[in-house]
């Protein structure tokens, strides 16, 4: 990519070509806001949510920093908790707003629009925005995952996926499948109404199995390989998971209760089950409550509904100061 740019030269060249042909372009980046991190250059710390163990996302159009978990927000003039200055924060990384700023700088005569849950209004304004996109009046769409959800754009001929590596290394057994599905859906938007659609994927990991499968259109081979690896690891859809989330004020109380649950589970003496944890969850705090999780894994698909497990879960006595939730085959592991 050029200096101070988040969009590579090949992508810029293809957008230029599309504009010359009066074709529509979609730039896909599954990251809301302007930048995912605000960093104080004086103190070398990031701006974090006061309620959750997450970083605040800079939303330039709303003049604020926002937590995407609990909704907490502060003004863009907020001061660093350490140096008490509001002048040292710099945005790190791109979001759709930042990409739009770059597009406006590169192609000042092109009409562009962000397509995300933050920017897309409801009611009549939503219909007007959709009409502008469908008619081709909007030259360049900059969209998050929302754009992959069944929308059809007749004039769209070019799709460019920015930062395709995002999420490929997340600690989730479904991450490769999820990434493949989303990118496949997005690039499938190009040329849906014609045969000359084009798709570009901007990546630092071109040899990654997901991206190679997309490049070579080897979807069936990729999914079969993925299934074989899941079977070998005894994870869904071959095995099953139950996630137990404990939340409360004190981590030590949650860990102690988690150990108690683990001992209770061991006392059931079940075959083909494993239990992991208790451990602090990847997002360790949400809405000022600490989170601890246990994970139960079954080697066989039928075992998770075993009556002993159901009865044990139903009869757990939870202390008043702990919130307890059960998620069978969790889709997210935060």
Question: What is the predicted role of each segment?
Answer:
Residues 1-255, 263, 267, 271, ...:
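Inter-lobe coupling/hinge segments of SF2-like helicase ATPases
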Residues 113, 269-281, 320-329:
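Short beta-strand elements
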Residues 213-215, 308-314:
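Short, aromatic/basic amphipathic alpha-helical patches
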Residues 251-257, 300-311:
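Short, conserved charged micro-motifs
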Residues 262-271, 311-322:
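A common structural junction motif
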Residues 277-303:
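Short, intrinsically disordered low-complexity segments
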Residues 331-334:
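Glycine-rich loop/hinge motif
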